[in-house]
Amino acid sequence: MSAWAPPQASPALLAVLAASCLGTAVWEEIAFRRLAMEAVAGALEEGRTRRLMAACVCSAVFTMLHLPEMGAALPAALRAVQVFLFALAMAGLVEQTGRLAPAIAAHALYDAICFAPAVLGISGSVWEISASSLMAPETSMSGMLASLLFLAPAAALGVRRLLAAR
């Protein structure tokens, strides 16, 4: 029995993965956490929950755009919760720091963790990507639940920051 060795990825493949994760993070954070969030917040009545309501609206749209067609109801529902929690966490991070750069870095890192195993040909793990869509990285129930456990406290902190906002 030989020892497991990670698959070898070409530098070009790793560069494409990095550029894709970073480019997606930059575009989505600007679009959702800066432009859309400010537009929705500006349209809402002043008040303690204005920023949180704007974040929830933008997070719902973000979630809808990230849901692939999925057959089973439970994985689809968990994926929706996962994406929504991620979006709230990013909104809270932007609110806390006043900058997009930390959210862009966190978003790019999260995407890299989700997509690198599939790009590198690693399968059979909690990160295995379904054959039907690259938009659903956590196809195993344990991977999905682990991701939700990681995202829930970050989203709760995001909500707290949004409620404390201007």
Residue ranges and their predicted role:
Residues 57-64, 77, 81, 105, ...:
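Hydrophobic residues within alpha-helical transmembrane segments
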Residues 26-31, 35-36, 40, 64, ...:
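Active-site His/Glu-centered metal-binding helix of metallohydrolases
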Residues 27-57, 92-99:
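Membrane-interface helix/loop boundary segments of multi-pass membrane proteins
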Residues 2-8, 67-76:
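Membrane-interface helix caps and helix-loop-helix hairpins in membrane proteins
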Residues 11-19, 27, 31, 80-88, ...:
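Membrane-embedded alpha-helical segments of multi-pass membrane proteins
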Residues 21, 51-67:
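Small-polar-interrupted transmembrane alpha-helices in polytopic inner-membrane proteins
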Residues 108-166:
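C-terminal membrane module of polytopic membrane proteins
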Residues 5-14, 44-48:
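Helix-boundary and loop/linker segments of multi-pass membrane transporters
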